[in-house]
Amino acid sequence: YITRLNLHSQEISNHVTFLAKQKKVRQIIRIFQKKIIRQHHQICCEGRDQASTILKKNPHYDVAFYFKCNLKTASLRRWHDLKKKIPLKEVKKSLRTRTLLDKKRRHNPLKKMADAVLIRTDILNKKAVIAKMSKEIDKKLISKYGRNFKAR
């Protein structure tokens, strides 16, 4: 069933903030995510608290990114993703509320890790974001494993 859901839909987004505040729900999800990460040694994780919570202690991560985008640009992009089915004003309000609640959440609030690479997505297009990420990944992996490092 979950494979047929659009996890980035407004309907799902409306419930995420409420669920993210529930300590027990976060614990269950964290255990599930850590299990998947242990099973797959090379994995790319995406989420608002992957580096600060899920990967914080063990297993360690090679590269972490913290994406920052101004509310106006983020709202427009989300509105286009939703095929303009919801008023832009509502999308903007929803994003503002979710970000504020995530940052002020008692358990594992949204924050940038000290070693995370900040990427300002409001001033870059997708291609530029990917190029910047790729450059940072190469730099970190070469620094950690040496110039002869080759991904499997």
Regions found by a protein language model. Name each.
Residues 1-43, 49, 72, 76, ...:
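ATP-dependent small-molecule kinase phosphotransfer cores
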Residues 43, 61-66, 116-118:
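Short, well-ordered beta-strand core segments
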Residues 48, 68-70, 122:
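Anionic group-transfer/hydrolysis microenvironments
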Residues 34-38, 54-59, 108-112:
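Conserved catalytic network of the ASCE P-loop NTPase/AAA+ motor domain
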Residues 3-8, 13, 76-84, 101-152:
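NTP-dependent small-molecule kinase module
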Residues 58-80, 93-96:
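Conserved phosphate-donor/acceptor-positioning beta-strand/loop module used by diverse small-molecule
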Residues 17, 21, 66, 80-84:
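Amphipathic alpha-helical interaction elements
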